[in-house]
Amino acid sequence: MVSTEIRVRYAETDAMGIAHHTAYLVWFEVGRTEYTRAMGLPYRQVEQSGTRLVVVEVSCRYHQPARYDEVLVVQTTVRVLTRATVTFAYEVRRQDDQTLLVEGSTVHAATDSGGHVKRIPEVVAASLTGTGRKTKG
Amino acid sequence: MVSTEIRVRYAETDAMGIAHHTAYLVWFEVGRTEYTRAMGLPYRQVEQSGTRLVVVEVSCRYHQPARYDEVLVVQTTVRVLTRATVTFAYEVRRQDDQTLLVEGSTVHAATDSGGHVKRIPEVVAASLTGTGRKTKG
Amino acid sequence: MVSTEIRVRYAETDAMGIAHHTAYLVWFEVGRTEYTRAMGLPYRQVEQSGTRLVVVEVSCRYHQPARYDEVLVVQTTVRVLTRATVTFAYEVRRQDDQTLLVEGSTVHAATDSGGHVKRIPEVVAASLTGTGRKTKG
Amino acid sequence: MVSTEIRVRYAETDAMGIAHHTAYLVWFEVGRTEYTRAMGLPYRQVEQSGTRLVVVEVSCRYHQPARYDEVLVVQTTVRVLTRATVTFAYEVRRQDDQTLLVEGSTVHAATDSGGHVKRIPEVVAASLTGTGRKTKG
């Protein structure tokens, strides 16, 4: 599990005075980026090597709202890995009292840069589950 | 079922050259706005009368990508209505060939303007299911 | 001058209860897209033919706020055209009372798809100023 | 001058493969938030005490693009302070080679929470220019 701090931006709030529900999906994406960096193979490099992890499913439950300037923590982990898909799970908490704000998950399919489905390359799969990193030790 | 046309904006695309997955949730929201207007009680008026329909759950499946300047159609309907929640369902299609791009649903809880959960007022419930409109006829 | 209708989305509002100031720049972009379509050479085709009009300057003055669900009109025109740049100007008005909300302009440089500055192709320049369309008549 | 680190999010890129030009204005806003925090009076508290600093003017020049996952530094300062307005200036640089990507400025008018123009309260003015902090020393 990889933790990433996020501070709610004014632009992310809406007329209800709280963070808009789409902001959490952007923060999940930031969480994924940091997860892959922590695992030793940043998503930027995954893309540069010709693999995209395209979002094919999103699911999200909102428990409590977040407000402008609050510091949140996104906890990101990989829950399922198949030949061609990976499922990330997320929890977003308010940092100061650890209240759980939102839980969610995203499923991604591997494609080449032309958008055609393919298997997840072994080096990517290994880094996503942390087995790649362990092997190095 | 209420249909709303959307044209993909450049700002909604990402470095994959396709509409970012969060754009669909914004389009769902546009679909809801138009659904409530078509049912005779625009969401703006619902809020002004002291009821908010806060997003508590989102789920979304992505089948095909959308690209800049394509015209899409969001079909919005109410699937479930309980005392305190309403569930909307959406389908997003490319207009020119009717390809199904994305399906999703959102669950909303009714709150007052202070964010406290409450029952959905009868006039709002009636308009959401169309029974309010029929009564007028 | 080309007019485009925009309805303010909930996602475009912020905690002040008004449209966030960045939303207008997105609407300018929508205005440009519709301007180029009205002139007979949609920006999508400009890009497909290998020319990008990259934003190099933005300037914007905000007079009055816009609110959720209001219908706005973006008026877009080309103010200056040089060999390698084009300047668009915009006015955003509230539709129902024609109040001027925001004025702005954007300067764009022509580049190839690799991002290298180049001259604006003659067919693009002609369509931007409407001289291309006139020639057809 | 207050420096703030920003990492470019995937959601902030567009189909050109670079950060969308509106992203910089959001980063300016983050820069302002951090500027006010560094000066001892976070903007959140300014708003809570009944003063809003509404954007009335934006201007921005784009020199070089930013890409997904790059770390940028936003340098924020107050350039002009009048009775009822404050002008912030910004420079955005790529962190690793200090290349200047974007320069900009925003002008803000003070209003009460109802949106009516007012003078900037003395405590806010002092914190914006740093004279408040110095006084404490």
PLM feature spans:
Chain A
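Hot-dog-fold acyl-thioester-processing enzymes
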Residues: 1-55, 113-137
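Short, well-ordered turn and helix-capping elements at secondary-structure junctions
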Residues: 10-12, 57-64, 96
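HotDog/MaoC-like acyl-thioester-processing domains
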Residues: 2-4, 37, 67-71, 78-137
